[in-house]
Amino acid sequence: MADTGEVQFMKPFISEKSSKSLEIPLGFNEYFPAPFPITVDLLDYSGRSWTVRMKKRGEKVFLTVGWENFVKDNNLEDGKYLQFIYDRDRTFYVIIYGHNMCSEYRDFPQVAVEVDDYENGEEEEDGDDQDKHQ
């Protein structure tokens, strides 16, 4: 019976080699399904997603088109490490580790939500307002 669990690898980010594309370790190729996927999704801890094209060059596999967006959006710089957890269904969950080797979590803009001060959607009667309208 085939193993269907997650598999993973880590890569250091080296801008000279990894800004435009990222080479996936050769030993990882056995985990890709046939037919070979044209694209994969990269997901971060917050659920943000990037669709990235995969390209084979001989035995080597690279993340190409779309990878630059991931690099830019995550402010990747030399010395950070990336952990890729593959679900074997075209999705990599990516954890970014900083220079201190601790995982990085970024704050993203929050949408302001207006909270209704009234219960059950009905306005409360205010004695002062009643006096003004009488």
From Swiss-Prot:
Matches recorded under Gene3D superfamilies: DNA-binding pseudobarrel domain
Location(s) in or outside the cell: Nucleus
CDD domains listed in its UniProt record: BfiI_C_EcoRII_N_B3 (cd10015)
A Gene Ontology molecular function term of the record: DNA binding
Primary subcellular site in the record, as a coarse category: nucleus
Transmembrane domains' residue ranges: none
Cellular component annotations (GO), alphabetically ordered: nucleus
Pfam family, one: B3
Binding region for DNA: 7-100
Amino-acid biosynthesis is among the record's keywords: no
Record keywords: DNA-binding, Nucleus, Transcription, Transcription regulation
Superkingdom field: Eukaryota
More about this protein: Putative DNA-binding elements conserved in B3 domains from the RAV, ARF and ABI3/VP1 subfamilies are largely absent in At1g16640, suggesting that B3 domains could function in contexts other than transcriptional regulation.
Official protein name in the record: B3 domain-containing protein At1g16640
Native source species: Arabidopsis thaliana
